[in-house]
Amino acid sequence: MASSMMVSTAAVSRTSPAQSNMVVPFAGLHSSAAFPVTRKFADSSKLPSNGLRVRCMQVWPPEGKKKFETLSYLPPLTREQLGQEVDYLIRNGWIPCIEFCKVGFVYREYHNSPGYYDGRYWTMWKLPMFGCTDSSQVLKEVDECSKAYPDYFNRIIGFDNTRQVQCISFLTYKPEGN
């Protein structure tokens, strides 16, 4: 082993002067004193700001108003707006699915650990609508679901079967009093 080290050392020592100058040895970190620095004092008028819009913003109340799905902060969608959302879902190549649930949000009733029936999993209405090309087909099924279960929340989800993920979800029907 020692002889092989000596051979490799000898090979390195025979290099020409041009090759030895190509790699500069590490000399440590340079101080920042060599770089010109312009110091600017903090001026609050130059900082990015929302301007007067901050006064217009409201905070969502933490109690009394439940947050549901993607568009839950908006007023309830009209029939035309629901159709536009479903058209968007179909244009992106997602599969529309209709689901319903009695409570409509995550809850735990009988135990502290998460379970199957704790509001994270909704019941699917019929089958996913593979091959659906028109929003009126989906809205017709939403109407049937809300007539069959008038005390349940209904939602539409857009499922991407290529990536195996749910891409969009929004409420289509809330029962009276919610």
Curated annotation (Swiss-Prot):
UniProt keyword Chloroplast, yes or no: yes
Cellular compartments per GO CC: chloroplast
Keywords: Calvin cycle, Carbon dioxide fixation, Chloroplast, Photorespiration, Photosynthesis, Plastid, Transit peptide
Pfam families tied to this protein: RbcS, RuBisCO_small
GO molecular function, one term: ribulose-bisphosphate carboxylase activity
InterPro entries named among the record's database cross-references: RuBisCO_ssu, RuBisCO_ssu_dom, RuBisCO_ssu_N, RuBisCO_ssu_sf
Entry keyword annotation includes Transit peptide: yes
Annotated localization: Plastid, Chloroplast
FT transit peptide: 1-55
Biological process per Gene Ontology, one example term: reductive pentose-phosphate cycle
Main location: plastid
Additional remarks: The basic functional RuBisCO is composed of a large chain homodimer in a 'head-to-tail' conformation. In form I RuBisCO this homodimer is arranged in a barrel-like tetramer with the small subunits forming a tetrameric 'cap' on each end of the 'barrel'.
Role: RuBisCO catalyzes two reactions: the carboxylation of D-ribulose 1,5-bisphosphate, the primary event in carbon dioxide fixation, as well as the oxidative fragmentation of the pentose substrate. Both reactions occur simultaneously and in competition at the same active site. Although the small subunit is not catalytic it is essential for maximal activity.
Family: Belongs to the RuBisCO small chain family.
Subunit structure: Heterohexadecamer of 8 large and 8 small subunits.
This protein's name: Ribulose bisphosphate carboxylase small subunit, chloroplastic
Record organism: Zantedeschia aethiopica
Upper taxonomic lineage: Eukaryota, Viridiplantae, Streptophyta, Embryophyta, Tracheophyta
